[in-house]
């Protein structure tokens, strides 16, 4: 089984060797689970039990799944993950730090697993970083080759590098590109985290902040100006708000709004520099961009990103930059 744990939901799937999902379950994560590792582990365990029950019901296997003597569960989470120890070192999205999540989930399932017919081989729970799972799935069944740079751009920005089909782990810290400091395009001389400038939610917030600031100036408001350093936390925006705000931002660009264009272009500039530096370090490997917020029209996002990257790499071979084929399902399928 693969399980993806986000701030909003737990998604669990069973997939076959071709990556096709056989059965799936999705459960919302209550707000009180944030920063409560034991409660979160219970929610993950509940999703796993529901998926197993659903699978056996679908196949009419009331006595258990024949031939299945062990259950192996891969769990993906955002943040810094020590995969060898099964520990979340730090996850802002989940509010966890130094949390042995794999062990907690295993404990939440131990009594249930002992009663599952035929499960003599026991239960194994493994923990993975979400972008690494997405990269591996895209390499196996999606748009990437065995060597790739996987870039997830949504509420946050994270990445993973696969070399020879194997994720580069970096003691759990590999892929935390969203935390890199870049020049803040909204405040001269200041710096901000990449994901507070160039994630989709950050660009929505920057555009909204610009409109509010213009409104305050127009009406002589004494409201406080936003602080430099980008968005305090791009993930404060919910996914529906980001999606709605993205439509507004793209609509403003199409209507000729210069501020909206500046926000979009400066975000793409930062992403292009990241990709170009990756190419300089690793060579022209596949670059796969996965974003639930990416508009269907590649002309707004991927095409200008490709042009910027091609310009920045100079006389180096430009990478093959493509949209993820598996979309939002890549992470849980990889797990």
Predicted regions and their residues:
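Short glycine-aspartate micro-motif
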Residues: 1-4, 70-74, 147-152, 158
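Short, acidic, Ser/Thr-enriched surface-loop or helix-capping motifs
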Residues: 16, 83, 162
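Glycine-rich phosphate-binding loop and adjoining helix at the ATP-binding site
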Residues: 32-45, 49, 53, 66-73, ...
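Glycine-rich beta-strand-to-loop/alpha-helix junction loops that act as flexible
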Residues: 71-79, 153, 285-296
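Internal alpha/beta domain cores that form substrate/cofactor-binding pockets in large enzymes
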Residues: 261-282, 287-335
């Amino acid at each position: 089984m693969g399980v993806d744990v986000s701030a909003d939901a737990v998604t669990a799937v069973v997939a076959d060797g071709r990556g096709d999902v056989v059965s799936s379950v999705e459960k919302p994560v209550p707000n009180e689970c944030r920063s409560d590792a034991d409660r979160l582990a219970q929610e993950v365990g509940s999703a796993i039990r529901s998926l197993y029950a659903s699978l056996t019901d679908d196949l009419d296997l009331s006595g258990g799944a024949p031939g299945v003597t062990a259950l192996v569960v891969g769990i993906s989470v955002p943040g810094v993950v020590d995969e060898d120890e099964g520990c979340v070192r730090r996850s802002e999205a989940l509010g966890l730090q130094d949390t042995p999540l794999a062990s907690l989930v295993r404990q939440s399932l131990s009594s249930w697993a002992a009663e599952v017919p035929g499960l003599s081989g026991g239960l194994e729970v493994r923990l993975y970083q979400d972008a690494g799972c997405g990269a591996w799935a895209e390499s196996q069944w999606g748009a990437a080759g065995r060597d790739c740079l996987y870039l997830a751009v949504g509420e946050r920005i994270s990445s993973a590098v696969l070399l020879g089909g194997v994720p580069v782990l970096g003691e759990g810290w590999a892929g935390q590109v969203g935390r890199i400091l870049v020049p803040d395009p909204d405040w001269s001389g200041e710096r901000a985290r990449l994901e507070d400038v160039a994630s989709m939610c950050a660009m929505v917030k920057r555009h909204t902040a610009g409109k509010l600031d213009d409104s305050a100036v127009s009406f002589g408001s004494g409201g406080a100006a936003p602080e430099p350093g980008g968005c305090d936390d791009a993930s404060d925006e919910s996914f529906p708000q980001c999606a709605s705000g993205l439509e507004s931002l793209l609509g403003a660009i199409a209507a000729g709004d210069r501020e909206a264009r500046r926000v979009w272009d400066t975000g793409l500039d930062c992403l292009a520099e990241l990709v170009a530096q990756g190419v300089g370090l690793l060579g022209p490997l596949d670059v796969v961009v996965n974003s639930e917020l990416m508009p269907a029209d590649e002309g707004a996002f991927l095409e200008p990103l490709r042009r910027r990257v091609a310009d920045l790499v100079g006389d180096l071979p430009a990478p093959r930059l493509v949209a993820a084929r598996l979309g939002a399902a890549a992470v849980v399928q990889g797990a």
